[in-house]
Amino acid sequence: MFNRVTLLALVSMLILSLAGCGGGEPAQQAQPAAEPAPPPKPEEVPVYELTKDDITSHAGWTSRNVSILGVKLGDRTRDVEKELGAVENTRTLSEDYLTVHQGQGLFVYTFKITGKARKFEVNETFAKKVTDAKLKRLLTSGDMKTMRDVLGMEEGDPVQNAEDNSTEYVYDSRGIRFIKYKVGGKTVNALRFSEMKKTT
């Protein structure tokens, strides 16, 4: 009797196993996996060289349109070191590496994590290499009327920075700041090009 029960249990399990393996549903053909969408291409903008082009003659120019010695914001600085010239000084800041070039007229801020240029600062020492007469005059004179003629009205009040003894005139929607540094009783004028920020 025990043998019959065991035999019946084994046959039942075999039948259930085969029934589970048999495809009661029609077989579906394997479909290839959908390809991921390509990342959106960055918007193409014309680029104007600070040392060759009359930048202010182009309507709507921003920091994204400006290159300095062939280097643009977002370029990997290791790839373009020779265009910038010899490194005269370096500093390590909290988020950036700062390198100084061109007779201390060009400051390049490189983001530590990506190695990409995220800010350029051009001061009056570099003005002799600037082609645009209006920008050259702004850097050499620091005249507020010239600043407003070239860049328009500021976006808010000037920012006082006690840490580096400077006053910054803000044009963040264009990625530009005009800065006046007080250094040893003298005023040094500079233009900072950085990533554009949204203003409200």
Language model: regions and residue ranges:
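Bacterial N-terminal signal peptides that target proteins for export
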Residues: 1-8
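Hydrophobic helical h-region of N-terminal Sec-dependent signal peptides
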Residues: 10-15
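C-terminal motif of bacterial Sec signal peptides marking the signal peptidase cleavage site
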Residues: 17-20
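A cross-family detector of function-defining hotspots
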Residues: 45-50, 55-61, 65-67, 72-121, ...
